[in-house]
């Protein structure tokens, strides 16, 4: 899977499962290429979500919801994820 496919899947799954105004996904893998733990095919992403639904939850609850939605992608394709809720 390439990063563009992953971004589309992440956006689609978030939008299908959470009421959101916007979902933005940024590839931050380039910042970690020189790290010893870097693996080809594993990506670092930054996820920015504008959602009243998530904003009303605390940080742990909103993160758990996102982790559950992206469970398969986290196991196979995402090495790290930064989540920003607005």
Indicate where each model-derived feature is located.
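N-terminal, polar/charged subdomain of small-to-medium soluble alpha/beta proteins
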Residues: 1-86
């Amino acid at each position: 899977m390439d990063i563009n496919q992953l971004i589309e899947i992440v956006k689609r799954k978030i939008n299908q499962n959470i009421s959101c105004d916007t979902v933005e996904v940024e590839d931050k893998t380039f910042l970690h290429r020189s790290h010893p733990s870097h693996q080809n095919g594993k990506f670092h992403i930054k996820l920015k979500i504008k959602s009243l639904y998530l904003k009303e939850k605390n940080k742990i609850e909103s993160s758990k919801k996102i982790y559950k939605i992206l469970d398969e992608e986290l196991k196979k394709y995402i090495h790290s994820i930064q989540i920003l809720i607005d």
